[in-house]
Amino acid sequence: MDPNCSCATGDSCACASTCKCKECKCTSCKKSCCSCCPVGCAKCAQGCICKGASDKCSCCA
C-alpha cells in the first residue's frame, strides 16, 4: 500500500488536482500520473496529472 495513496500500488485510485500515487492510475479524472512534468512538455501536459516538476522526464526525452 502506498502511504500517499488510498490504493495498492498499481491499482486504480481517485485523484483531484495532484497525484501522489507512484504507479496509480486516476479513475475519477481519467488521467495517468506523471512523475515529472517540466513546463512546455507537450506529452506530459496532455492526459496526465503532474506529481512534480522536473527537467528529467522520460516521457519527454
UniProtKB/Swiss-Prot annotation:
Binding-site positions, a divalent metal cation 5: 34, 36-37, 50
Q: What is the lineage of its organism?
A: Eukaryota, Metazoa, Chordata, Craniata, Vertebrata
Question: What domain of life?
Answer: Eukaryota
Q: Which residues carry this modification: Phosphoserine?
A: 58
Q: Where does a divalent metal cation 3 bind?
A: 15, 19, 24, 29
**Positions where N-acetylmethionine occurs in the chain:** 1
Positions with a binding annotation for a divalent metal cation 2: 7, 13, 15, 26
Key words, A-Z: Acetylation, Metal-binding, Metal-thiolate cluster, Phosphoprotein
Q: What is known of its domains?
A: Class I metallothioneins contain 2 metal-binding domains: four divalent ions are chelated within cluster A of the alpha domain and are coordinated via cysteinyl thiolate bridges to 11 cysteine ligands. Cluster B, the corresponding region within the beta domain, can ligate three divalent ions to 9 cysteines.
Family the UniProt entry places it in: Belongs to the metallothionein superfamily. Type 1 family.
Q: What is this protein called?
A: Metallothionein-I, hippocampal
**List of residues binding a divalent metal cation 1:** 5, 7, 21, 24
The segment annotated Alpha runs over 30-61
The GO terms describing molecular function are: metal ion binding; zinc ion binding
Q: Name one GO cellular component term.
A: cytoplasm
